[in-house]
C-alpha cells in the first residue's frame, strides 16, 4: 500500500516549487520540480525540508529523490540533512538515493 502527497512552495500565490511524494512501507519516492525563471533564494531548501519532514516516516527508511540536474541549493540541503548519498544523472534529472534522517 502506498500514500501519495503533494507539497507546494508558493510566493504570493505563485507556484515556485513542488514535490510529489509516494510513501511505501520500506521506501519513499519523491519527485522535486522547480518553476522556470527566477526563484527566490531559499525556496528550493524549503521544498527539500518539507520532503524530509514528511510525518510518519521512520528514520533510516530508504529515500529516492528525483531533482533537477545542476541544482546546488537542493543538493546541498540534502547533503546537510542526510548521510550516505548516491547520485546519478539521467538527462535533465538527477536521481539520488539515501535514507531518511533522524529527527
Where on the chain are the PLM-derived regions?
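C-terminal "cap" of GNAT-fold acetyltransferases
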Residues: 91-103
Amino acid at each position: 500500500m502506498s500514500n501519495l502527497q503533494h507539497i507546494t512552495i508558493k510566493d504570493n500565490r505563485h507556484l515556485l516549487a513542488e514535490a510529489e511524494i509516494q510513501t511505501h512501507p520500506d521506501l519513499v519516492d519523491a519527485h522535486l520540480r522547480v518553476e522556470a525563471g527566477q526563484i527566490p533564494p531559499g525556496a528550493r531548501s524549503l521544498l527539500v525540508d518539507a520532503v524530509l519532514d514528511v510525518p510518519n516516516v521512520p528514520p533510516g527508511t530508504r529515500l529516492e529523490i528525483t531533482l533537477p540536474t545542476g541544482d546546488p541549493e537542493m543538493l546541498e540541503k540534502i547533503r546537510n540533512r542526510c548521510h550516505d548519498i548516491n547520485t546519478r544523472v539521467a538527462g535533465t534529472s538527477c536521481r539520488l538515493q539515501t535514507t531518511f534522517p533522524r529527527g
